[in-house]
Amino acid sequence: MIKFSINMHRGCFGGCAFCTISAHQGKFVVCRSKESIVKEAKKIIAMPDFKGYISDLGGPSANMYGMHGRNLKACEHCKRPSCVNPMVCPNLITDHSKLLEVYHAVDALPGVKKSFIGSGVRYDLILHKSKDEKSNEAAMQYARELITRHVSGRLKVAPENTSDRVLKFMRKPSFSLFYEFKRLFDKINKEAGLRQQIIPYFISSHPGCHEEDMAELAVITKGLDFHLEQVQDFTPTPMTVATTAFYSGYDPYTLEPIFCAKTPREKLAQRMFFFWYKPEERGAIERELRRIGRADLIAKLYDGVQYHGRARYDAKAVGSSPERPDKHEQGRGRRQGQEWRDERRQTKGQRADRQAQAQRENGQRQKPKRTSFNPNFHPKTNKRR
């Protein structure tokens, strides 16, 4: 728990393949009463160092408060791991009215200047169109109040990937829903005269995700004007479907083989696409795109601007051998390339003599050569004292 934050409910019916919340908190959302939440808010207000800002009114997913099945008996016998994937269950009540009542009650307390939502928001629940029009209206009202009153400047959401194939295995909604939510977010911001941001969370190296998927993710997020920061590499966690697939190499439901990036080089080859905008990553990204046969994405990522930078030595494509830094790779001229090859042909002793001569010419004192860090060895004679 973060100081000055209030946990309103526990449990999550999202059932994401990489998440353990449903395993240790349960699939059914258990909510605190509005009176209990207001009572805790009053205790926070009474704290001597409280400045009037509640950092979070949330839970595992901020907007699952008050949601449950219409027929609870059917829920008790249901074997679906997720109530919202591949589509929202028709038995699920997705009304945001109770959540809005809590927000209004907390904001009305004297001493509360503003209450923020720091937990992640499920935008698929906001955009879901149910048969109940009042529920749909409450969802739009929630979106407007959330964006205009309860965002500190950045709203956190978790699309996790852009490939629908990978998202299907993750049990996450299609990325097209994120486009729709971003349009709604931008529209409300424009109408309210705000300049707030969406902060999307993404995962690399998830089972089923390839380098090509991450390359397309980089192109798509660039088109949305994102410079990603809130990212992580997939970490196997007990009691999850994704970890079962990572360990076994098979989809546990279909028993079909599934690709998993496991070695550090394979993981780095995916992770670096998050940071396409960093100059030090460009050389490795271009080599990797050529290796996987997607050189067409280079122009989309870098707008056709030719790369003349110097890449890191270890940032080479997965499975490739170290390349010589010749004029074609690093923009060196023929003379510089020849000097580099001549220097590589020199023996260790020749290089040491050359360095010593350069130091003498520059008037620098030549430091004694030490071949061991053992204090029992003399640095000049290299013999034991």
Language-model segments: residues:
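Catalytic cores of alpha/beta
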Residues: 206-223
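Conserved SAM/AdoMet-binding glycine-rich loop
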Residues: 43-199, 203-207
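Radical SAM enzyme [4Fe-4S]-AdoMet core and its adjacent flexible, acidic
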Residues: 68-97, 168-170, 174-176, 222-228, ...
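Radical SAM enzyme core and accessory elements
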Residues: 239-385
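N-terminal pre-triad scaffold of radical SAM enzymes
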Residues: 1-20, 38, 45, 51-58
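Conserved, mostly hydrophobic/aromatic
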Residues: 12, 16, 37, 157, ...
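Iron-sulfur (Fe-S) cluster-binding segments and ferredoxin-like electron-carrier domains
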Residues: 19-36
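Flexible inter-domain linker/hinge segments
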Residues: 1-7, 26, 84, 275
